[in-house]
Amino acid sequence: DTRDGMVRTYREMIRTVSEMGEVVAAEGIDCGFVQGGTVVAATRAGQVPRLKASIDLANRAGFGESDLRWLEPAEAARHVAPSRLFGASFTPHCAAVDPARLVLGLAAAVERRGVVVYERTPGRIVPGGVWTPAGMIRADRVVQAVEAYRTQLPGQRRRVIPVYSLMVMTAPIPATMWGQVGLGARETFSDGRHLIIYGQRTADDRMAFGGRGAPYHYGSAI
């Protein structure tokens, strides 16, 4: 059923994180990959029951403490130290990474194995594959890895809603300040608010921080 499918999908997502780390190491891809887990901090008292409820839901789906657990404030502060901290949830199944360098490294790895990567090739999804000016590519499955930009493809404008995510990044932060902030294992982080935020400590000691506060633009405009 739908629930079982969701659980299988989540377990596959967990497996993918470790597998990606193995590939990065085997191929020598310099992308700052560190699997330090992710911590979701409760920075308001009202966020505590919401985060604990998400842990209970995971437990009922068959995930244990090794997958997702609650941290009391003192333990949570060893991961990240915001000005207010009422506890946090923590999962080890997450990694910090530079996505652009990861993609370029993966492309180079498959090219070394004889795969041809075609760039700057316009394509249009049609039944049974992808049409290009140079010919038809036939495939049983087509992965539309274009995120919100799918709305700019012919016939796709109303099939997805583009959701924006804006990011900022600091200059390199000195070690003395990181001692106050935390993230010593390069944990990724968020908090329990309804608005999605996220961040990570980069390989060169910057803080990369983002959120989903940007508005939807009328007509699925980009």
Regions from the PLM with identified roles:
Residues 18, 26-34, 124, 135-176, ...:
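Active-site substrate-recognition segment that forms the wall
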Residues 45, 74, 78, 222:
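Flavin (FAD/FMN) cofactor-binding core of flavoprotein oxidoreductases
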Residues 54-61, 68-76, 84, 97, ...:
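N-terminal FAD-binding dinucleotide-binding subdomain shared by FAD-dependent oxidases/monooxygenases
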Residues 38, 68-70, 88, 117, ...:
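Conserved beta-strand scaffold positions in the cores of enzyme catalytic domains, especially
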Residues 1-73:
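Dinucleotide-binding Rossmann-like beta1-alpha1 core, especially the glycine-rich loop
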Residues 49, 56-61, 83-141, 145:
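Helical element adjacent to the flavin cofactor pocket in flavoenzyme catalytic cores
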